[in-house]
């Protein structure tokens, strides 16, 4: 695969958490205090909403912040959740210090061991998930640590092509301890895209990390419901929902490597810190991914939309195939038909305006309705084996 040109997201959304971070020996052990405790906040760009051919885009709703603060212009704070951020503290001419920021949803910790204060350049990615590794250099040459002040190249290996996780890279960092006021609104001066400089200082409570992230994947939001008249006759229980992507008729491979070139700027203009991204397929297995995510139990669909999110590698993708597996019951609870399977092919430029291929940082919303082909002249087979149709 070749290069994917970077795109500038239309809007920005924030991910904000403020929790004490202490260094520890590993992700699985209790944290032990290091000489330089760290506290973390982060924001991530909002998805650009793909405009449907027949109606306007919706705004993305964010969850509330856990503390009052004045966000950078154009950003909105959301909750911390469960995240693991792969991080590299770098200095020109030095080996990078690699570690993680990780949260269980209520507190943050770090594996970074920072014993000497100083000026660093902070790079990273999220989420760090099982089986994924990452290396860094200051140029395309491996093991080049000469000029992190100018940017970096992250190579994130073995990423799933379709995943429940929002895959992002760090595009800006700052030490903001001068801006923080406990239990009060505060602003973050100088937090800018393309500025990776971060100062580690001595003194308890002074290392507050502010991080900016940007998406390198696209997002797919699927809304499913049952036709109202049909819902009076049958109950639909959704068991599986998964997506497969393809580019120019070639199905995307299951795993890939992402090489992301970042350039440092002073943040004074609209230059995108993501210079380019190369996605390289790994292995020969064709990919598909479950959209249902962490839901282990089947879902009874109703006439109200059930919503599911997934993320996928966007390079060259012009078609998505959604497959749903469900059981059909009568209104007495008797199983009528098991493991019905329906596949729907989404041709991008037929459903979304002026888009022949998916773009990173863009979210695509698809509405699906389960209904029989001819509701008012039903054969028994049609009643018990309904189709799934796009209703965008």
Indicate residue ranges for each PLM-predicted region.
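C-terminal motif of bacterial Sec signal peptides marking the signal peptidase cleavage site
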Residues: 20-23
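Short helix-loop boundary/capping segments
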Residues: 197-204, 212, 217-308, 318-319
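Extended, compositionally biased non-globular segments
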Residues: 297-350
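Aromatic sugar-binding interfaces of carbohydrate-active proteins
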Residues: 25, 340-356, 363
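Sec-dependent N-terminal signal peptides
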Residues: 12-18
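Surface-exposed loop/edge segments in extracytoplasmic proteins
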Residues: 92-102, 250-258, 332-345
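Bacterial N-terminal signal peptides that target proteins for export
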Residues: 1-11
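Short, low-hydrophobicity acidic/polar segments
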Residues: 28-237, 300, 316, 323-325, ...
